[in-house]
C-alpha cells in the first residue's frame, strides 16, 4: 500500500508541476503535459487529430492499434523526440532500455525541468528502471491465474494455491431413442399353447 501511495503522490506532483506555465525556455520548466493519440500508420507525420482517432478506436469502427504520444507541450524551436507507446504491445513492448521509464512517460526529465525530473528520475532509477541509469527491473507482481488464491495476501508472497482448471459443463437433455424395430406381439396369447 505504501508503494501505491508513494507512486500516486509522485504522479500527482508531476502533473501539478507540469500544469504550471512555461517560463519562456525552449525546453520548458513546467508546461502542460501533451498527450495525444494517433494512428500507427501515420507515425512519420504530425497529426493533430488525436481525439478523432481515439473516438474512432473507442467506437469500435476501427480496430487497428493506437499509439499514445506523451511529452511536454510543443514550443517554438524545440526538437523533442517523442517515443510512441503502442497500446497492444504488452508490458515488454520493444525490450530496449528506454521502455517502461515512468519519469519519461509522465513527462519527467527535460519537459518537467532538470531539478524535479532529474532528482526523482535518478532516485527512482535503481528501483523501477527510471530515467537516469539503473538497469531495467521487472515488476515483482505477476498476473494471477483464474483460480489462484494467495496464502498471505498483502505480504508479496508467491506461495499460492492454484485450483484445477474447470471447464464449462453443459448438460444435454436425455431423450428416449426411437425403437429399432417394431416387434410383433400376438393377441390373445396366440402361439403360446404347447400343443400347437
Swiss-Prot record:
<comment type="function">
    <text>Chorion membrane (egg shell) protein; plays a role in protecting the egg from the environment.</text>
</comment>
<dbReference type="InterPro" id="IPR005649">
    <property type="entry name" value="Chorion_2"/>
</dbReference>
<comment type="similarity">
    <text>Belongs to the chorion protein S19 family.</text>
</comment>
<keyword id="KW-0732">Signal</keyword>
<protein>
    <recommendedName>
        <fullName>Chorion protein S19</fullName>
    </recommendedName>
</protein>
<dbReference type="GO" id="GO:0042600">
    <property type="term" value="C:egg chorion"/>
</dbReference>
<keyword id="KW-0964">Secreted</keyword>
<dbReference type="GO" id="GO:0005576">
    <property type="term" value="C:extracellular region"/>
</dbReference>
<feature type="signal peptide">
    <location>
        <begin position="1"/>
        <end position="16"/>
    </location>
</feature>
<dbReference type="GO" id="GO:0007304">
    <property type="term" value="P:chorion-containing eggshell formation"/>
</dbReference>
<dbReference type="Pfam" id="PF03964">
    <property type="entry name" value="Chorion_2"/>
</dbReference>
